[in-house]
Regions:
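GHKL/Bergerat-fold ATPase module in large chromosome/replication-associated machines
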Residues: 117, 135-158, 178-181, 188-703
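GHKL (Bergerat-fold) ATPase N-terminal catalytic module, capturing the glycine-rich phosphate-binding loop
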Residues: 1-185, 192, 199, 215-219, ...
Length: 703
């Protein structure tokens, strides 16, 4: 072939300045593009061999070599694929590849940020000009009597092509790096980028420094293969040591046997795993392989709890592994890693348009060859095929979790504390996932047993039934009352029914802090009542959703009110005088005219005072804090606390009977702070006053 000088395209402007400036933060993708081209060339050559159109040489080993040369400022990508003839270079490099790159840039030039384009596939060979001022191609086709070809381009629209000197089938691409991109000729930087994009490509990839001196290693002679280049055969004679026996005699004992070794040129080690674990059938994978793969990919040396192996061929091809790490920290600060691949080529991390958002708390890899590339994120969001992929992944995760709950409840309970934030977050974010997991949400009760929501409700019903049975022997001797009394009773019953109709939902009591709410827990347990532990910050949103989806239930924190079972059966009228007196006394002592005070006769006489806050009021306070409204008056939303005083307690009786005593204000303040302490931590200022007051009271006792 005579030398040829030509234009890449007569119908296009010079695209190279655009390529050089485009995707500045992602210049390293040229590694992926050029290595992918080499993999494709090797795959095609192997297919030709299978079809009988070409016969591979004995001992043929597909490989891609990358040679870095920081001194010469060059990078070489060498494959032993099918190679190209001059006509093919003309067609594929000068026309098709250039046209494809031009179309790609034209289509996405206004969407060049990483937030817009998925993976940045499409520049292909011409991605080399993102980092190079000049590129050479040397190629020899597999075709019989093919002539090697040499092609050069210096970053303009013109090229030169001539006969080359390559002697083995395949293609070698040489990049002459520009001054801004010399980092890519650094061996460590090159390794980093290759492992980022190409860790699982199907062809072995080898990296070396060009013209570097040979390195050697010594191996046992029996391990030498015909591929090894032996530099020297080494014989290490057996070694003996003198040993003294019990009878005092001495003898020579062999401590290391005679060994034959070979000094060989160090064997190259591929940077990638050509058979990733996700590509295997789940039945062929061991637990240790799953754990090893997890540690390797995610650099996390804490073992995952368990994993899901995705393996689907129809109606789309999708494989992958999702790992469940421990997720018992604040869910809104957790960031997992889901790596998305296309035919074992890395695309990007955490593509939420493909992978359901709640799965971002997990770690895993998903390989989907059918995933559309060269599309914007907005296009993926509206792609029905992509939605099917997302739905499938959600279904498999839900199936795994529900299946574990049904067939291995013990393991499911063991993992629950770690995985519950993920499951609850998934329920909040994905209705379909929530539908599938609704019956497999667990709640840990005060005895550390795990219950489903129906089991929680059954427990509450059992407690209520027990209390009802105890009250069946109440006095019913009212048959001879007059009609007026009957009318009064009927009216009272009607009022009660109306009140029940207002909120007939079944309560599920819960605790957010076992230590802080210990007094309330004790009161519950004394009455054989139960509550569930909801101590994660996702629980507030989660129980709101549960109430929306299950209109017959309501979640009530254990300190929202005192249940009837904790109190003696006393009418309000009997306690009215005590309530009025104590309200006036406490408001005066605490200098708080808005203080809500109530008086009850609690069965536990040791309890002097407790604080209650309605569930609605507390949730409103939580919402105010969440939205930075903490300075607003919570009473605007029914959020005032109520101080409950126990009329059966000796100290409360003392205050009631000695309201004018000089010590009563101190006792009132102390009782109020004690009630607050059992509900929530005191402020630093309030705690200081509480400690000083405690010392004062002890001093009074000492006198």
């Amino acid at each position: 072939m005579n030398s040829k000088h030509g234009n890449l395209s007569i119908n296009s402007d010079n695209i190279f300045p655009i390529i050089k400036k485009w995707l500045y933060s992602d210049h390293d993708i040229f590694y992926r593009e050029l290595i992918s081209n080499g993999c494709d060339a090797i795959t095609k050559l192997k297919k030709l061999d299978l079809m009988g159109e070409y016969e591979l040489a004995d001992g043929y080993e597909p490989k891609i070599q990358i040679l870095v040369n920081p001194e010469a400022k060059t990078l070489k990508f060498i494959d032993n694929g099918l190679g190209m003839t001059a006509d093919e270079v003309e067609e594929y490099i000068n026309q098709i590849a250039f046209s494809g790159a031009s179309d790609f840039l034209e289509k996405y030039k206004d969407k060049a940020s990483e937030e817009q384009i998925i993976g940045h596939f499409g520049l292909g060979f011409y991605s080399a000009f993102m980092v190079a001022d000049e590129v050479h191609i040397d190629s020899l086709s597999y075709q019989k009597d093919a002539v090697p070809v040499h092609w050069t381009c210096d970053g303009g629209t013109e090229f030169d092509m001539s006969d080359g000197s390559k002697t083995d089938v395949g293609t070698e691409i040489t990049l002459f790096l520009n001054e801004d991109c010399l980092e890519f000729a650094n061996e460590y930087r090159a390794k980093e980028v290759i492992q980022k994009y190409c860790s699982f490509m199907p062809t072995p990839i080898f990296l070396a420094k060009e013209n570097a001196p040979e390195e050697y290693e010594t191996i046992p002679a029996e391990e030498v293969t015909e591929k090894d280049k032996v530099i020297e055969n080494i014989v290490e004679e057996a070694k003996f040591e003198e040993k003294e026996n019990e009878d005092g005699t001495k003898e020579q004992v062999e401590v290391s046997p005679r060994m034959e070794k070979a000094k060989i040129v160090k064997r190259p080690v591929a940077l990638n795993d050509t058979h990733p674990l996700w590509a295997k059938h789940p039945n062929d994978c061991t637990d240790e392989e799953y754990k090893t793969f997890y540690r390797k990919v995610f650099q996390d040396y804490k073992e995952p709890l368990f994993w899901i192996h995705l393996n689907m061929d129809y109606p789309f091809n999708l494989k992958g592994i999702l790992y469940f790490p421990k997720i018992n920290t604040e869910y809104d600060s957790i960031e997992g890693t889901i790596k998305l691949y296309n035919n074992q080529v890395f695309i990007a991390d955490n593509i939420k348009e493909v992978i359901p958002e709640f799965l971002m708390l997990l770690k895993g890899v998903i390989d989907c060859p059918d995933l559309p590339l060269n599309v914007s994120r907005s296009a993926l969001q509206n792609d029905g095929f992509v939605q099917k992929i997302s739905d499938y992944i959600t279904k498999k995760v839900a199936d795994k979790l529900s299946g574990m709950c049904k067939t291995d409840k013990e393991s499911y309970e063991k993992y629950w504390d770690d995985i519950s934030p993920f499951i609850k977050f998934g329920c909040l974010k994905d209705e379909k996932f929530c539908d599938k997991m609704n019956d497999y949400i667990l709640f840990k009760n005060l005895d550390d047993k795990y219950l489903t929501l129906p089991e929680c409700l059954k427990t509450e019903e059992g407690t209520a039934d027990s209390k009802d049975m105890d009250s069946e022997n109440a006095d019913n001797a009212s048959e001879n009352t007059d009609e007026a009394s009957k009318d009064t009773e009927n009216t009272s019953e009607a009022d009660t029914d109306t009140e029940e109709e207002k909120d007939s939902r079944k309560p599920v009591y819960y605790v957010t802090d076992r230590q802080q709410q210990g007094q309330y827990i004790k009161m519950f347990q004394e009455q054989d009542m139960d509550a569930v532990i909801l101590d994660h910050n996702i629980d507030a949103s989660f129980i709101t959703q549960l109430e929306r989806r299950n209109e017959n239930i309501k979640f009530v924190r254990i300190d929202a009110d005192l249940t009837d079972s904790m109190k003696e059966d006393v009418s309000e009228e009997d306690l009215k005088e005590a309530k009025d007196t104590l309200t006036e006394t406490f408001r005066k002592a605490l200098s708080n005219e808005n203080l809500n005070v109530n008086v009850e006769k609690l069965k536990n006489v040791e309890i002097s005072s407790v604080i209650t806050l309605s569930e609605e009021g507390r949730r409103m306070q939580d919402m105010m804090k969440m939205y930075g409204m903490a300075g607003m008056d919570s009473s605007m939303f029914g959020g005032d606390q109520t101080l409950i005083l126990n009329a059966n307690n000796e100290l409360v009786k003392y205050i009631l009977e000695n309201k004018d005593s000089e010590h009563v204000p101190v006792f009132c303040e102390q009782l109020y702070d004690l009630a607050l302490l059992s509900n929530h931590p005191l402020s630093p200022d309030a705690m200081g006053k509480f400690v000083a007051r405690s010392n004062k009271i002890m001093l009074l006792l000492a006198k």
